[in-house]
């Protein structure tokens, strides 16, 4: 809860002043002057409702308090993380792996890694093995030069810089110079739970998300060398980045793919050399480590509530029938991939199989990366492009289209699903509720497991479907706009 003491009062005041100063439409105000969307009776009623003094005050107060609470929480989190022995749980794996690499020992060997983990971190017992690919070793090599606490501090600073790059990249992709929309974009991206959670545990998901985001920015400008290097580096966590290699192959951006493959291959062999490993030995150790890693309760689809991917939906619904559970998850994923493939075919056929890349495609591939592969809470940072897409879609509707209740319902479904992945709902509400049970011991009631605690997984599915529907609808709208002299389009065919 927010403490309304002296310092918190100052923070609340500063946040309110900053938001007020930036809550301006600027160029958008003139662009919206003749908007058919805003002239709709439904929108006019909403505008009148929110213009009521009490409603306007409550909305503004709510935004100020949420932003203030978030800033206070993040500030205290950063402070505690820079103290001796902070709870950066995931970071410890990277640190131990780096230390072993400096000794030319293999972190992929289960016995060596477990013993070193106990020695370096003083945490012993069952330790999940290091299941990352060897191309991550050169990227975390520098950690081994520092003590544990110094490396902690450096890692936190790197995360803060990465969050800054994520916010910057999101604003680059936003199709508005309005301060109000840029403020909304910045707040919405910052509230994604994965950003805070990644900072809290010291994972690498934020780095991968930033590399993917800037890869798209560079690729859109046909700077394939920079984009390829970003993709090659992002493949240190292949569950989040591997689908983009396939995507660029389908887009025939072969130079970008070639550079990414050269980058990741160089890192792989360098990582193997640093750990005195051969490829066959690595594959043997990785296979054994992966089988042990699957026994971790935080990974099990039947126990874990931290997983976001759709592969846990079936096992949660049918815990006593593994075959049916896996079949259901596979079917959901197959249908989702098929629908995304259909959209891609429509997009390519309308653009003459162009090599140009689109934000909707980036968002859908990002969503699929979370949905079809093993994904934890930190992976929700991959939803940053989804925030920008939904804002850009709203801007497009206001500028060029008439109001459609069906389309706005889909848009609102996407926004509400994205809200589930924020620190407010996923981080504070759902996680706080989970503390009432011993989740790892399997004490969570079935009805809770398939409803409230499954919301993040359902939200990933809903976000993907919503954006897919909006993207297909936009294709039709833009086709009509080509033949509409007044640059207005009706959604009657939607």
Please report, for each region that a protein language model flagged, where it lies by residue.
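Hydrophobic cores of alpha-helical transmembrane segments in multi-pass inner/ER membrane proteins
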Residues: 8-18, 335, 384-389, 456-473
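Aromatic-enriched
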Residues: 2, 72, 391-494
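Transmembrane helices and adjacent periplasmic/lumenal helix-loop junctions
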Residues: 231-248, 372-379
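Hydrophobic/aromatic-rich transmembrane helices and adjacent perimembrane loops
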Residues: 376-393
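A cytosolic-side transmembrane-helix exit/cap motif
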Residues: 227-231, 278-284, 401-407
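Central hydrophobic cores of alpha-helical transmembrane segments
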Residues: 231, 260-266, 361-366, 406-418
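Membrane-embedded alpha-helical segments of transport systems
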Residues: 236-238, 266-270, 419-423
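Primarily membrane-embedded glycan-assembly and transfer machineries that use lipid-linked glycans
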Residues: 1-220, 224-226, 248-377, 447-453, ...
